Amino acid sequence: MSIREEIVEARRRRIAGRGHAEGTSLPAKRRAPCAPFAADPAVICEIKRRSPSRGAIEPGLDAAEQAGKYRRRGARSVSVLTEPDYFGGSLGDLIAVKERYPDLAVLRKDFLLDKEDIRVSWAAGADAVLLIASLLSSEELESLCREAKRLGMDPLVELHGPEDVEKARRAAPDLVGINSRNLETFEVDKGYPAMIRPLIDWDARCIFESGITGREDALFARSAGFRGVLVGEAAVRNPDLVSELLSAFGPEGRWAEERPFWGRLFARLGEKRGFPQETAGGGTGRLGWSAGRPCPAPLVKVCGITSAEDAAQAEELGADLVGFIFADSPRRAKPDLPREVKNLSCLKVG
């Protein structure tokens, strides 16, 4: 049994024994209307005490105090882990955060399974709910998205691979999270979300989840087409990181969006792995490669290009990138050579 399966099975047992609120007393009346979740700049800061992959992070963390640290540094959306056994959270944490800071948009992050989970989340004060596509059927996912919206909450649908994209297409959620952490092994591959992002062929705001440790990671995510990030352990340990991440998704980081090098690079790698790429509303048609199987072919870069003819031949032979040397060298390229080969589909690196 995988870690994810253990967590879900434990949650089912708690629901059977204590109900969907898992013993937490819910407010008699919701005190604040739902706040828009993940508004730009979408830096979502997480509140968690531990995790299966990292163990103890901040065991004595006070949820409301941590939310205040994020809020003072400019964050307007927070994620509260309410899973007790593996992450050390509870619905009480979410209630405390929303009561202290009703203006914050709060995501309930848990392994939610049915409509009663959605209704309990709303009653506790959540403005958004995380729905993990791999735990649900396509029909269940669509139904839970609809229930969340009926209550005024934003569903954040979390995807982990091409199969999840296919499953989510029917619901076509407005807010999609792509997780760099494999929920079977809990290992992180920061390039993986950038390979999945091109498969989203409906109008959605995409959030990069897990593995964010600094501004460079956030700029990478923005360059790959993501509108925001969800950051957990790094923010818990260093709340000052919040301002750096907000900067990456503000005007100072706009260049990353305008020069989507990383998005294009990992889209090519996704194609090599057999991932279907974006189609004009007609779906993708196949699922291809899946995580855990060996990559059929690596990315190839040919360096030291000195002529347009060489660049064209490199592309014809399968190069994904061509490189130009502009420092003093026998292979120094003319300054205008990249412009001469701009119509080649391979990426250019100087």
Feature map (PLM): residue ranges:
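Thr-Gly-centered strand-to-loop micro-motif
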Residues: 108-109, 131-132, 179, 208-209, ...
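A short alpha/beta connector and helix-capping loop motif
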Residues: 117-135, 141, 147
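Short, conserved loop/helix-junction motifs that constitute active-site signature segments
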Residues: 200-201, 342
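Conserved N-terminal beta1-alpha1 strand-loop-helix module at the mouth
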Residues: 1-106, 113-115, 138, 147-175, ...
